[in-house]
Amino acid sequence: MFGKNTYLHLPQVSSSLHSRAATSVVDLNGNEIQLHDMLSGHYLTTANAPVLESTALFNNNNNFNHDVVNGLNRDPSPTFPTKQAVKKDRHSKIYTSQGPRDRRVRLSIGIARKFFDLQEMLGFDKPSKTLDWLLTKSKTAIKELVQSKSTKSNSSSPCDDCEEVVSVDSENVTDHSKGKSLKANNKCKEAMDSHQAAAKESRAKARARARERTKEKMCIKQLNEAIVLRNHQFEVSGTREAFVHPVFGFHQQNYGNASHENWDQSNLSSQSNQLCAILNQHKFIN
């Protein structure tokens, strides 16, 4: 009478009625009829699966819409991690002191031309044979290189070389700085010596000028003293003549005047001699 789809989706239409079916009583035409949940087992077993799937899809759609609104444009389809294929190197590595090395060697254009020309001249079909031939021919050079490396490593390590270079540089810097300081000190000493010599010379000249001034002052003082002494003698001689009384009259007066004149002349000559001697001495000293 009812289709399968309508029968299955009948509880979805009135979910509240289904929730109340087991516990509530419905009044139909005054008669109390208790509804039994006859479809509960069938709903839980058959109809629950599609409802759960539909709700899961609805939740996924809601999550996708929420991500789009928030700016996260994620793929709603489930993603599975895929393993990237690792490329296998067909060539085996060679382990050296500096780590694994590839057996393949990339040559420049010029070296490749020379190498293949040599290979053609030798008639080898493989490049490894050509390299073997080159290594065998250069054994002596390789031995010399190994010996030189060993002697250098035994004689001095790189740290020692660096320390020696640093010490030499520091010594050169100190010597250069010492040389500069010595030159500066020498210049300062020379300047001080020249200044001191000029000061000494100026002081000596000042002392010489002072001595000349003192000598001139002494000469002038002696001349003034001689003049004062002569005037004093003139005054004394005039007072003595005033108190002399004539004894013999006219002859006595003339004798007195002659003697006075002779005394004055001798006094003046002695003073002039003294002045000449002082002046001559002053000139000789200068």
Curated annotation (Swiss-Prot):
The record's annotation in InterPro entries points to: CYC/TB1_R_domain, TF_TCP_subgr, Transcription_factor_TCP
**Region Disordered, residue ranges:** 72-100, 193-213
| Name by which UniProt lists this protein | Transcription factor CYCLOIDEA
Q: Which UniProt keywords apply?
A: Developmental protein, DNA-binding, Nucleus, Transcription, Transcription regulation
Query: What is the role of the protein in this entry?
Result: Involved in the dorsovental asymmetry of flowers. Retards growth rate and reduces organ number in the dorsal region of flowers. Binds specifically to the DNA sequence 5'-GGNCCCNC-3', and is able to bind to the RAD promoter sequence in vivo.
Q: Which domain of life is it from?
A: Eukaryota
* A single GO BP: specification of symmetry
Query: Is-annotated flag, keyword Lyase?
Result: no
Any GO MF annotation of the entry: DNA-binding transcription factor activity
Where is the protein situated, by its record's location annotation? Answer: Nucleus
Q: Do the record's keywords include Protein transport?
A: no
* Domain R positions: 200-217
* PANTHER family (alphabetical): TRANSCRIPTION FACTOR TCP1 (PTHR31072:SF224), TRANSCRIPTION FACTOR TCP4-RELATED (PTHR31072)
Annotated ranges, domain TCP: 87-145
Q: Which GO terms describe its cellular component?
A: nucleus
